[in-house]
Amino acid sequence: MKNVLLQATGLVKRYGSRRVVNGIDLEVREKEVVAVIGPNGAGKSTTLDLILGLKRKDAGNITYWREDYKAQVGVQLQTAPFFPKLSALDNLKLFAALRKRKLSVEEGVQILERCGLREVVQTEAARLSGGQQKRLGLVHHPKLVFLDEPTAALDPRARREIRELIRRLADDGASVVFTSHDMEEVGKLADRIVLIRDGRVVAEGTPEDLLHRHEVENLEELYLKLTGEADA
């Protein structure tokens, strides 16, 4: 069995009397891609914020695989993490330095080339396209990556490039947790799906298991059935 990188149990977040996250459990194992899906306002993004410490939880426990995990966690919440005035290469070298690792120019160029960024090695990050910026934010070899709608607002080519990069990260040994409303994207990328509705997990499993268990033919039907949007 694969090692557990993240174990979140009983997460609760209240805004006044409303529980936007209501007892959510989430487990992430090494080398797996987990898609967190659900309608707008279901609690997906808030759950990620609680796990990352960006918002204070009202209840629950979060355990990572090691105490100094932060240097090995990559985060991309709607906007990509980078330093706009630094070149793509200098951003990569800084990411490495933050993880206490030396990165030579040659190594940096090779990494950027592998991610389709060879032509912008010396370009300021602020001048990169949206798709290039998102790729730059994911190339520093994290062990665990959190992505909130990583392909939102991108053109078809950029979406394809980000999907390929996510799959490459997983193939290289990273675990990825991402939110998405695109069921085609979820089907192509996810090893496991967690569906949230009204702040609770209502379904969890592999795509194949969920389709079989709920007797539907595709993930779009599954989504509509379990969120109640099929009756809307």
Residue ranges and their predicted role:
Residues 52:
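Helix-to-loop junction immediately C-terminal to a conserved catalytic motif
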Residues 124-128:
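Conserved ABC ATPase signature
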